[in-house]
């Protein structure tokens, strides 16, 4: 049998980066109907592939390994897929047994802009884990979606040394609009020694989100951003726990970000778009100041701030980063029907600023997260 899978991108509406990166607080997040996918089918050994669907001009990438090969070496080629195989092999005795007896071809693709702040790198890890679970018919209780999300975080953080939290690993699997609670996950301990994320779906009460998203085309690595900010947070937080007194700057920034998340949940359920927009603006102000405090000369990134300021000047209710700053993406919450005005304004400033790779789109909410089809 062959299995086709897709998972959606994500944005953090409010609360970022409190997903156990800089603080274990909460985010209000949404899955977007922009997807990455995979095909898993029988093969002689293990074949990993990246199918190019963009205009980058880069050739497809294909790697082949002998049956049951472990560990797969990290060399900069398809390391996210290799990391998923290695981590699942380490975690699951059932997978180890079946993997040695049956080969698989795992081919992946994506429509999510590269380094766009939409959780794109994590999608490959999730597709690999979910694809292998389906192909090898692994126990669905022992390998449930919460476990896969947690394994995906360890693939990036432990296997590959990428500083990351948990939103990018949960939202694509579970989908919808949700309030995510990350309490007691700051230290990112071993699987089973800390809580799973609490994933509270809200889209039964939220018909749609009037959003416009822009990927700036400015390359950045979210791991590089958090690699500077997370150690600063942990250092200040640990010292504060010992000495007491007034909270240090990083703790104040993130306590404020958490307030935008829980207050945003209340406003979102009430359909109070102006209040949600105001909280988005406050969240972005905090992140911009925090990044400046952590040594990023242009705060959340000059291109991001340009698009955010332009959106607000053209009537958006709120605008902020989708995830980590530097490059990546920004998004705006608008009055329903005003999407075209923001798109036109962004197209104009992108042309003026020479951001020729900027990609602007109006996303729908992906109410289904992981989709698996059997052929």
State the predicted function of each range.
Residues 1-14, 18-19, 32, 36-96, ...:
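C-terminal nucleotide
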Residues 22-23, 30:
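Phosphoinositide-binding peripheral membrane targeting modules
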Residues 25-26, 38:
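Catalytic-core region of right-hand nucleic acid polymerases
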Residues 106-109, 146-153:
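Short, conserved phosphate-binding/catalytic loop or strand-edge motifs used
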Residues 110-116, 317:
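Short pre-catalytic strand/loop immediately N-terminal to key active-site residues, enriched for Gly-Thr
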Residues 117-139:
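DPxDG-like acidic metal-binding loop motif
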Residues 324-325:
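Long, low-complexity C-terminal extensions of enzymes
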């Amino acid at each position: 049998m062959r299995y086709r899978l897709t998972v959606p991108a994500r944005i953090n509406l409010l609360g970022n980066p409190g997903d156990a990166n800089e603080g274990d607080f909460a985010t209000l997040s949404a899955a977007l109907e922009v997807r990455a996918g995979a095909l898993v089918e029988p093969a002689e050994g293990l074949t990993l592939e990246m199918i190019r669907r963009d205009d980058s001009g880069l050739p497809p990438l294909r790697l082949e390994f002998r049956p049951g090969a472990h560990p797969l070496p990290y060399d900069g080629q398809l390391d996210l897929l290799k990391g998923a195989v290695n981590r699942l092999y380490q975690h699951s005795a059932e997978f180890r047994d079946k993997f040695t007896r049956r080969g698989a071809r795992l081919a992946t693709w994506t429509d999510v802009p590269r380094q766009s702040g939409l959780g794109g790198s994590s999608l490959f890890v999730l597709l690999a884990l979910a694809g292998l679970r389906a192909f090898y018919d692994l126990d669905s209780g022992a390998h449930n979606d919460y476990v896969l999300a947690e394994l995906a975080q360890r693939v990036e953080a432990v296997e590959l040394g990428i500083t990351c939290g948990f939103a990018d690993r949960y939202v694509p699997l579970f989908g919808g609009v949700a309030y995510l609670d990350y309490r007691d996950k700051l230290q990112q301990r071993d699987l089973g020694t800390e809580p799973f994320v609490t994933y509270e779906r809200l889209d039964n009460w939220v018909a749609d989100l009037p959003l416009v998203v822009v990927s700036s085309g400015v390359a950045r690595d979210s791991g590089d951003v958090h690699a500077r900010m997370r150690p600063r947070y942990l250092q200040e937080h640990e010292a504060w726990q010992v000495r007491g007194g007034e909270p240090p700057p990083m703790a104040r920034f993130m306590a404020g970000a958490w307030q935008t998340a829980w207050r945003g949940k209340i406003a979102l359920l009430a359909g109070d778009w102006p209040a949600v927009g105001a909280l988005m603006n406050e969240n972005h102000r905090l992140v911009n100041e925090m990044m400046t405090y952590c040594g990023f000369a242009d705060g959340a990134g000059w291109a991001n701030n340009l698009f955010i300021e332009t959106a607000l000047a053209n009537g958006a209710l709120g605008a902020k980063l989708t995830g980590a700053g530097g490059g990546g993406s920004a998004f705006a919450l608008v009055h329903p029907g005003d999407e075209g005005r923001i798109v036109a304004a962004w197209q104009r400033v992108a042309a003026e600023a020479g951001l020729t790779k900027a990609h602007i789109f109006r996303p729908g909410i992906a109410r289904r997260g992981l989709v698996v089809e059997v052929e």
